[in-house]
Amino acid sequence: MKIQFRPMLWPSIFSIVTFIILCSFGTWQLKRLYWKEALIQRYITESQSNPISNPSEFSKSKINEFKAVEIFGKFLHINEIYITGKTYEGNAGFHVVTPFKMENNKIVLINRGWVSEGYKDPNKRKFSLAEGQVKLKGIIRYPQQKGYFVPENDGENGFWFTIIPNQIFKFIKTNSNFVIKDYYIDALRLGEKITLPIGVDGKPNLRNQHLSY
């Protein structure tokens, strides 16, 4: 007796659809992998290049993200804010973001780095409040994009989740004629000694796990 194979309709359709979805997901993962690898390489190239000394002369369209900078000016500590939900070596804390007035009177936001909950209050870390003119080395960063599940910034209640210069300057009521909204600067940690706030180490901290699923 000859048995004729007759595939069931709905299981077959489900299998085909699943196959198409998996192929599409794999293609998307590869594209993300190539994009992330290019981003990491760009970070290395720009951050290790000769620093520019007056980034305020450039708009976002004329200055590359991750470009190394070296600027002079003074911190406006009275207007610092705190980005919540940040960790350092598994410890919860905040990133301290402080306006920085450069020699040409332009004001740019500096992400000075991480502090623990116990040092969020500037009165408990007066040693970190540099006074007068200082030299700062850092890396240009474009305004952050709010993630889908990330709450909106709420400056009135002291909750900041995303570094968006336009929002921050508006909240601290800084003269819009002097502020830089196109980017902010990640401060680099200097030397081997770790001091608060803990700035970036100049290495690409960009997770690349798009082939590990």
Which sequence ranges carry the predicted segments?
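Surface-exposed, charge/polar-rich loops and edge strands
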Residues: M1-E57, K67-Y213
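Juxtamembrane extramembrane loops of integral membrane proteins
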Residues: F58-K62
